[in-house]
């Protein structure tokens, strides 16, 4: 739980204390990582791994359904898009550097999951996924239909060969 708070605070002690106070106010004295993600509006890591699996396996439909689930839960699509961008960045770092808990500020178990998931995807595809998600994050702020931007990014990530054909 503390690692999640520290990551969300991005090194700011006051921000970390504020997040911790919010979590205690909403959840009481026993606060789990899932509770913290809920307070912050983000998704827990298992949901991100599942959505990334769908994208890596070429299942755009499942990834779009994941986005629909985020919306139904009242979560912020922008936060979800940013979380997915961070997740694919972690996969790219895992692919390039191997064990890199220090760079990613993650536990050894999470690092092992990143390495396993990254092993099923090429470096170029991971870079393209990070780029597509970062474009979606930046573009979503200015669109009246931000959902379409993120769905389009998911479809491009899930079907890289079809996206390349369309660009040709």
Kindly give the residue locations of the regions a language model identified.
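Extended, largely alpha-helical regulatory/partner-binding modules appended to the mid-to-C-terminal parts
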Residues: 1-167
């Amino acid at each position: 739980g503390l690692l999640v708070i520290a990551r969300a605070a991005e090194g700011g002690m006051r921000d970390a204390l504020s997040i911790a106070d919010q979590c205690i106010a909403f959840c009481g004295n026993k606060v789990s990582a899932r509770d913290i993600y809920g307070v912050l509006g983000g998704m827990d890591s298992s949901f991100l791994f599942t959505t990334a699996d769908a994208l890596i396996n070429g299942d755009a439909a499942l990834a779009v359904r994941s986005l629909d689930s985020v919306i139904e839960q009242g979560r912020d699509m922008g936060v979800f898009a940013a979380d997915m961008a961070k997740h694919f960045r972690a996969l790219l770092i895992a692919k390039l550097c191997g064990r890199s808990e220090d760079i990613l500020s993650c536990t050894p178990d999470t690092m092992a999951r990143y390495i396993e998931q990254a092993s099923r995807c090429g470096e170029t595809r991971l870079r393209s996924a990070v780029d597509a998600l970062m474009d979606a994050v930046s573009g979503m702020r200015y669109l009246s239909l931000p959902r379409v931007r993120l769905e389009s990014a998911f479809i491009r990530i899930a079907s890289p060969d079809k996206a390349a054909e369309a660009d040709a």
